[in-house]
């Protein structure tokens, strides 16, 4: 599909690249926990409106997040092997064009949230703020992954607000679980760029953890599973939910086989594998309510 766009509409291609529409992994990593929240908040039968709005919102806000991230990193991406081909780094698009695209995506997201209730509307501003803040945190903290986790998890309280009109305690427990998971998988992602980031003075948990990176990832993944077990216990879930968590744990084990030598591309594939971890949890959740 995207090869056709690149050949037929070459002027659109840099915008697609900037929004990462050709690389859906980020959308999937944002989508799975959003669906967890939507399904739990709706007790297995969420509103179709909520499903559609949050699905489209995930696609739009992930695209917007990529745009503002590349805008923030435009002076660094050309010096990092993995990001040298990004449109702002190559000059295919200007900073002004990126900001205009970000504004347009923000307006689309704003239009979507108008279909939901007032509490969800006000919560959406928190999500926007976190999305804008995250890319710039790499300049002043070794924990930008924590800010990414906060941003990537914000759809969880929003989903509960949209379905139930409130944000109960269980929503925040699910939020914490997803923040922990996000920090774990984005540390794997940061391992790919560690050498380049050290040269450029860019901060990350991969640099902060140093030789303890694999241990810290394992601890974060274990805490993720513990938090999700607590979610299941509080909701009275049975074997389908826990079977999904077994699937997630097997995915985590496979990832550790990939990152054992801390090589760039195996670490990237470990990051990609998290899509299956999130999918396992949702499949278990779906059959829990089936």
Swiss-Prot record:
Its cofactor is Mg(2+). Its main location: membrane. One of its GO terms (biological process) is ubiquinone biosynthetic process. It catalyses: all-trans-octaprenyl diphosphate + 4-hydroxybenzoate = 4-hydroxy-3-(all-trans-octaprenyl)benzoate + diphosphate. Pathway: Cofactor biosynthesis; ubiquinone biosynthesis. Its EC number is 2.5.1.39. One of its GO terms (cellular component) is plasma membrane. The chain crosses the membrane at residues 40-60, 99-119, 120-140, 142-162, 165-185, 215-235, 239-259, 267-287. It is a multi-pass membrane protein. GO terms for molecular function: 4-hydroxybenzoate polyprenyltransferase activity. It holds the Pfam family UbiA. Keywords: Cell inner membrane, Cell membrane, Magnesium, Membrane, Transferase, Transmembrane, Transmembrane helix, Ubiquinone biosynthesis. InterPro entries: HB_polyprenyltransferase-like, Prenyltransferase, UbiA_prenyltransferase, UbiA_prenylTrfase_CS, UbiA_sf. CDD domains: PT_UbiA_COQ2. It is found in: Cell inner membrane. Belongs to the UbiA prenyltransferase family. Catalyzes the prenylation of para-hydroxybenzoate (PHB) with an all-trans polyprenyl group. Mediates the second step in the final reaction sequence of ubiquinone-8 (UQ-8) biosynthesis, which is the condensation of the polyisoprenoid side chain with PHB, generating the first membrane-bound Q intermediate 3-octaprenyl-4-hydroxybenzoate. NCBIfam families: ubiA_proteo (TIGR01474). PANTHER family: 4-HYDROXYBENZOATE POLYPRENYLTRANSFERASE, MITOCHONDRIAL, PRENYLTRANSFERASES. This is 4-hydroxybenzoate octaprenyltransferase.
């Amino acid at each position: 599909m995207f090869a056709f766009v690149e050949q037929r509409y070459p002027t659109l291609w840099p915008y697609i690249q900037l929004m990462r529409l050709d690389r859906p992994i980020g959308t999937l990593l944002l989508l799975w926990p959003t669906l967890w929240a939507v399904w739990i908040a709706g007790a297995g039968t969420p509103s179709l409106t909520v499903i559609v709005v949050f699905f489209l919102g995930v696609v739009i806000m992930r695209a917007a997040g990529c745009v503002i991230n590349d805008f923030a990193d435009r002076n660094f991406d050309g010096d990092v092997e993995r990001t040298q081909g990004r449109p702002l780094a190559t000059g295919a698009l200007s900073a002004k064009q990126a900001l205009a695209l970000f504004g347009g995506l923000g307006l689309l997201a704003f239009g979507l949230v108008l279909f939901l209730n007032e509490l969800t509307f006000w919560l959406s501003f928190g999500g926007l703020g976190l999305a804008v803040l995250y890319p710039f945190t790499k300049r002043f903290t070794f924990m930008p992954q924590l800010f990414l986790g906060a941003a990537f998890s914000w759809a969880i309280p929003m989903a509960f607000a949209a379905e139930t009109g409130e944000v109960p305690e269980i929503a925040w427990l699910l939020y914490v679980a997803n923040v922990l998971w996000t920090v774990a998988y984005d540390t794997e992602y940061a391992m790919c760029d560690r050498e380049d980031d050290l040269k450029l003075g860019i901060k990350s948990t991969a640099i902060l953890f140093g030789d303890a990176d694999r241990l810290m990832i394992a601890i974060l993944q274990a805490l993720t599973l513990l938090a999700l077990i607590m979610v299941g216990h509080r909701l009275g879930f049975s074997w389908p939910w826990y079977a999904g968590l077994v699937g997630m744990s097997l995915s985590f084990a496979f990832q550790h086989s990939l990152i054992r030598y801390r090589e760039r591309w195996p670490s990237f594939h470990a990051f990609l594998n998290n899509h299956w971890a999130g999918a396992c949890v949702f499949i278990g959740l779906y059959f829990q309510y089936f």
